[in-house]
Amino acid sequence: MKFHSKLQEGIFLKRYKRFFADIEFQGQQVTAHVPNTGSLKSVNNPGQHCLFSESTNPERKLKYTLEMIKSPTGSWVGVNTATPNTVVRETLHHVVGHKKEVIGGFAHWAAFDEVKPEYKISAETRLDFALKKNNSDKMHFIEVKNVTLAEEGTAKFPDAVTERGQKHLRELMALMEQGHTAEIVFTIQRHDCGSFSPADDIDPEYGRLLREAYQKGLRVSPFVLDLTPESVELSETVLPLKM
């Protein structure tokens, strides 16, 4: 995913009312939209460098969007929750159906022939992606989760209690019982982690459900994102699990 123009760099001053951030930029204070409902627990540190995008849409109330904050370890941390789905969608469309060309972390996606985004499984629920083979009525369902939290070199999810995330795990287990396969892609929007674990201290029920689903065959894929001021890409680096 390429940004429309190179991100601007400033100093993160504060986040408030969840969706607003003040940034020092070229000697002035500007306000940016924060596209993240989580706590941003490990990067909500005033004084850190940050990167933000600028919209050319004249109807937007805030023309700036906070995209990344530099962590105390020196890693850029992506905070835009829309980024992971875009990056995974681009990767899937590049990989699916190209069986002979794909190796490594994405190889299991190449076995499928079609990508169906925002796949409706009930009146109330859509999952991020469904992958389909031409000769099968069974699907591979994918739900994408954004990861910003890290503690002692371990990426963790969630950074706040997520009843929606719990619901998705129950639904994925139900789909697996019907003979489908399922996967959660945890997109690690930082480079300073060597493993992934559920954040049991924040949402113990999510951790319990994730382990149950994993034991029942859920594929858990913590992919690291490559973050730069020009683009964000899904790397083939899959972190080891600490379950």
UniProtKB/Swiss-Prot annotation:
Any one Gene Ontology MF annotation carried by this entry is:
DNA binding
Q: Which Pfam families does the annotation name?
A: SfsA (PF03749), SfsA_N (PF17746)
Source taxon at top rank: Bacteria
Please state which protein family the record places this protein in. Belongs to the SfsA family.
Q: Which NCBIfam families match?
A: sfsA
Report the protein name in the record: Sugar fermentation stimulation protein homolog
Instruction: Identify the taxonomic lineage of the organism of origin.
Output: Bacteria, Pseudomonadati, Bdellovibrionota, Bdellovibrionia, Bdellovibrionales
